[in-house]
């Protein structure tokens, strides 16, 4: 996508926010950088996000986000004839506003979807690449207040995922290594849930929190992923304008199971990831907020024979500016 097209999208969304009683509009980017061995995965991802109130005095809130992924590492290392997808567009849409409260318990769900379309370069050798993905998502957000200081919570999403694999298919019963046809898989699944979390509010209004996180991803006739992770962090309100929120994520278990219709079906391999970082927010004025995030991540993986792969280290950077109306 060239700069002109991206500018037109930003302009259209900006005009739309005025027409639909926008709560806020956010512009930003994410950048992922890997060590030399894996740096073909380096990406730069600009985005725009809008929160809308379609009806005045209604609790209904609509969220729309557009992000463009430029995998410049792949272009840098393989050129314009790179065999794999190098660019991707993502659209997210969510609706929320309903809230059920019963004494100390609250239930405030959110529903929506994520859609991704990838640019896949065609080659003589068929490769299994997903060029379209639709993930329907339900967020069963719940909280329970023990007292004024302690709160338990559940957050995250669950939902089915539909993938179209281009230029070869996953290894199902009809797999052909020379096929260049597309195949759609309707029974994939994706969820990320903090199944139980706890927050403790300190006397100075800062918050300490910890949670048990589960990720499950099913790619039919390819691989299934099951992760259990410990997450913890500290929300530090330095003053009325600046907040810094350091966090740690540590895998307790991360198992990948082979789901191909081959002799490797059912084999497992272990992975382990550790992430250390922080988010930051600075309120420039009552309607303008600067945001950011940085983290370092180490990933250890192995193959289905139990052989360790070289560690995959990543640095992540994010910068955003949000205008409230």
What are these regions (language model features)?
Residues 1-26, 57-61, 309, 325:
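Cleavable N-terminal export/targeting peptides
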Residues 21-79, 316, 322:
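Short glycine/proline- and aromatic-enriched beta-strand/turn motifs that initiate or cap beta-hairpins
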Residues 23-25, 56-64, 100-108, 148-154, ...:
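Repeated loop/turn-to-beta-strand initiation elements of outer-membrane beta-barrel proteins
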Residues 29-37, 52, 66-74, 97, ...:
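Transmembrane beta-strands of outer-membrane beta-barrel pores
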Residues 40-46, 50, 83-91, 130-138, ...:
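Residues that define the transmembrane beta-barrel architecture of outer-membrane proteins
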Residues 46-54, 91-98, 113, 138-144, ...:
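Residues on the lipid-exposed face of transmembrane beta-strands in outer-membrane beta-barrel proteins
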Residues 141-263:
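Detector for outer-membrane/organellar transmembrane beta-barrel domains
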Residues 282, 294, 311-325:
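Outer-membrane beta-barrel "beta-signal"
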């Amino acid at each position: 996508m060239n700069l002109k097209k991206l500018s037109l999208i930003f302009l259209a969304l900006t005009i739309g926010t005025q027409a639909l009683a926008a709560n806020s509009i956010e512009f930003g980017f994410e950048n992922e950088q890997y060590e030399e061995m894996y740096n073909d995965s380096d990406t730069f991802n600009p985005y725009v996000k809008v929160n809308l109130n379609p009806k005045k005095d209604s609790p209904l809130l609509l969220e729309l986000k557009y992000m463009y992924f430029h995998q410049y590492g792949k272009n840098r290392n393989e050129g314009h004839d790179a065999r794999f997808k190098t660019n991707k567009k993502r659209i997210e849409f969510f609706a929320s506003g309903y809230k059920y409260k019963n004494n100390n318990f609250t239930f405030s769900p959110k529903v929506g979807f994520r859609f991704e379309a990838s640019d896949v370069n065609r080659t003589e050798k068929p490769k299994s690449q997903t060029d379209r993905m639709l993930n329907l998502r339900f967020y069963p957000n719940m909280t329970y207040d023990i007292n004024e200081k302690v709160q338990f919570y559940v957050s995250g999403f669950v939902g089915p995922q539909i993938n179209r694999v281009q230029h070869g298919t996953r290894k199902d019963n009809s797999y052909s290594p020379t096929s260049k046809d597309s195949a759609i898989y309707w029974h994939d699944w994706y969820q990320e849930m903090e199944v139980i979390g706890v927050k403790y509010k300190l006397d100075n209004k800062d918050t300490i929190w910890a949670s048990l996180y589960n990720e499950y991803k099913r790619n039919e006739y390819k691989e299934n992923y099951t992760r259990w992770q410990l997450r913890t962090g500290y929300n530090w309100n330095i003053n009325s304008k600046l907040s810094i929120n350091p966090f740690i994520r540590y895998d307790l278990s991360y198992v990948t199971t082979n789901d191909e219709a081959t002799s490797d079906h059912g084999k497992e391999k272990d992975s382990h990831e550790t992430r250390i970082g922080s988010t930051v927010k600075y309120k420039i004025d009552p309607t303008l907020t600067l945001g950011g995030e940085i983290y370092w991540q180490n990933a250890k993986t192995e193959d289905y024979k139990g052989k360790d792969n070289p560690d995959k280290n990543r640095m992540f950077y994010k910068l955003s500016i949000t205008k409230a109306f």
